[in-house]
Amino acid sequence: QAMREFQPALPLGVALSGGADSTALLIACAARWPGQVVALHVNHGLQSAAARFEQHCRGLCASLQVPLRISKVDARHQAGQSPEDAARIARYKAFEALALTEYAQPAIKSIAIAQHADDQVETLLLALSRGAGLPGLSAMPHRWERGGLAYCRPFLRVSGADIRRWLGEQQVAFVEDPTNTDVRFTRNRIRAQILPALQAAFPQFRDTFVRSASHAAQAQELLEELGAQDAQAVCGEDGHPRIKALQALSRARQANVLRYWLRNSYGVAPSAAQLQELQDQIAACVTRGHRIHIKVGQGFVQRSAVKLTWYNP
């Protein structure tokens, strides 16, 4: 069912790690669109099994007669950055380089990633544990665009167990990631301890959790549309919001347009505490001499005459 609903722009790149999920995705895509699929493998070099993953990918692609493009990256994390974030950033940069290189034929238009319903539930639970808003509760999108490519996750409504069951029926081998059982990682603890408990209490939890994330994503889209409309109304030609125009909005609508302005103009997101303080200062701004200077992200929002500006010192 998931593959029947999947209609990517072709040619298609498939992100292939060598694990069960990406192995299944490549086999399914290669069978459906022969001659239109390219496998993309990123070797992070972060674990001893990296060479085994790459070897499996080479053998699988040879058996399927699917072209394989490989990128070796330095995914070591910087200070203040999680290993997962560093690996993800390096991986997407590599995907873009592999897909868009002028020497690569065919020219890839879409990239499919094999994250599934269990991954989506884990992402949603992590967002809930952080007290995330709608962007976090939307979890992972089914489809998005980045760097001139369309990315897709066709397995987001399919359980990991169903994928492995299908691979078993096909008698296809894959490589087990040795880090998946390391409970020092939060995702692995969720997978090993929380998901089985949810399965016992609520057997349909994958479907309902994924549906909730979809509802949150739709609500976030509406807030984005409203934010764009309000930003056009409250911001001058210079793109900075006018304080009096902000004061005329309800507090919820004001918070939304401030988030929209900061994210789209500067790529920063205020914390809940920072946003509340900023709104309190906007409400109190009734005299010419009232000063606003609040830290947001790596910079500051400040009052400049009748408007707000953000700067990074």
Where do the protein language model's features map onto the residues?
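Electropositive, surface-exposed helix/loop patches at the edges of structured domains
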Residues: E102-D118, T208-L226
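Short secondary-structure boundary micro-motifs
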Residues: I111, L156-R157, L198-Q199, A283-V286, ...
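Mid-to-C-terminal catalytic subdomains of enzymes
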Residues: R164-S214, Q218-E221, G299, V306, ...
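A general boundary/transition motif marking the beginning of the first structured unit of a protein
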Residues: F155, D182, A197-Q204, A245-S250, ...
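Alpha-helix boundary/capping and short turn/kink residues
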Residues: R130, L134, G160, Q199-P203, ...
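AMP-forming adenylation/ATP pyrophosphatase catalytic core
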Residues: Q1-A20, W33-H44, V73-H77, A90, ...
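Core alpha/beta nucleotide-donor-binding catalytic domains of modification enzymes
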Residues: Q1-A192, P196
